[in-house]
From Swiss-Prot:
Family membership: Belongs to the methyltransferase superfamily. Rsm22 family.
Record carries keyword DNA-binding: no
Name of the gene encoding the protein in the UniProt record: METTL17
Subunit text: Associates with the mitochondrial ribosome (mitoribosome).
Main location: mitochondrion
Any single Pfam family the record assigns to this protein: Rsm22
Molecular functions per Gene Ontology: 4 iron, 4 sulfur cluster binding; metal ion binding; mitochondrial ribosome binding; S-adenosyl-L-methionine binding
Protein name as catalogued: Ribosome assembly protein METTL17, mitochondrial
Function as written in the Swiss-Prot or TrEMBL entry: Mitochondrial ribosome (mitoribosome) assembly factor. Binds at the interface of the head and body domains of the mitochondrial small ribosomal subunit (mt-SSU), occluding the mRNA channel and preventing compaction of the head domain towards the body. Probable inactive methyltransferase: retains the characteristic folding and ability to bind S-adenosyl-L-methionine, but it probably lost its methyltransferase activity.
Keywords noted in UniProt: 4Fe-4S, Iron, Iron-sulfur, Metal-binding, Mitochondrion, S-adenosyl-L-methionine, Transit peptide
Amino acid sequence: MAAALKCLLTLGRWCPGLGVAPQARALAALVPGVTQVDNKSGFLQKRPHRQHPGILKLPHVRLPQALANGAQLLLLGSAGPTMENQVQTLTSYLWSRHLPVEPEELQRRARHLEKKFLENPDLSQTEEKLRGAVLHALRKTTYHWQELSYTEGLSLVYMAARLDGGFAAVSRAFHEIRARNPAFQPQTLMDFGSGTGSVTWAAHSIWGQSLREYMCVDRSAAMLVLAEKLLKGGSESGEPYIPGVFFRQFLPVSPKVQFDVVVSAFSLSELPSKADRTEVVQTLWRKTGHFLVLVENGTKAGHSLLMDARDLVLKGKEKSPLDPRPGFVFAPCPHELPCPQLTNLACSFSQAYHPIPFSWNKKPKEEKFSMVILARGSPEEAHRWPRITQPVLKRPRHVHCHLCCPDGHMQHAVLTARRHGRDLYRCARVSSWGDLLPVLTPSAFPPSTAQDPSES
């Protein structure tokens, strides 16, 4: 016990923002018998455990009334009898969408199929027949990605399908920034792929007192018109509910003007190639003054492209001579190491929300999404507490938490008051999927080998 406490105190001098302590790369185990709640700053400050600073999940999110009224007015004036079916079809299509297959991957698959056909002695192959067989097999086994062109009609369907869920996901991301950095008061925001303008509304709900300029960029003219109507309560005239909103169809490439917050929500997946995504992420980071917020569907495809964007920024390939400050991961990762979940389940989160009260909507709903928030500066500025990556499983006298730890590893922790201390146990019990657990996870401790306690 004394040796463990000495090790904990020694490790406390290691700056948690700088990554893994130099002693070892072992799993960040929650060691029984050692109180590891991060008390160095008196984090509870006489508050109850249910209000510990790692709690970040929002209650049910609701659209601003002006936005909900505008959406209902637009839909009542334009929707046909098949709107419900169109909404369901588009929702399913967007959720199940994969990334476009890159040319190099297509060539690799074609060579593999050609080799497979040539190895079959029962097939007499001419060069023309072989080429036809390979193409036929490729068409059957390759995802056919198509670019969506948002006309006036499709933009309206998208609004009915995604306005409320998109607002909920972005609100959760913005809430994390505000909760962990309450002194941050942005004045400018740029939204790439702005669509219906849900990012602008979510940002106004969080930082409406400080934001003075919102730049909305979307290549669809019809979508920009729809977003502007929503700002005016669903009409083409009148004063916008949020002042200082500007619309344009093309992304400004000049790095001279930066925005305090830059956002891309459900837009990187709409780009036709990895090269296009790389170019856009580089441009977005150059335009970022403080925070770059990227949000996508909580699927393997969405998580994968967000990790590509994260790695691109962290490797520093897009450094601008006008702003040489490095980037670090503000959320959700408590580290800058490779994602330990990339080969398994998608790292996703869930936000409950009240949908727009259309006839087909049921209450409440959950928006499942993946996100990454990148910030300029030093990792020392961010919390390095473990992130809860799955729903917390509460059982009598113990609780299961799946954690992404600051050393870049996943841990399934089974916590009890007797083995881990009352503070840590109570904090874990009141925490939810997506929260931070205010606990020190020194990598010098060996992984816990204790078995899960009986659930009887």
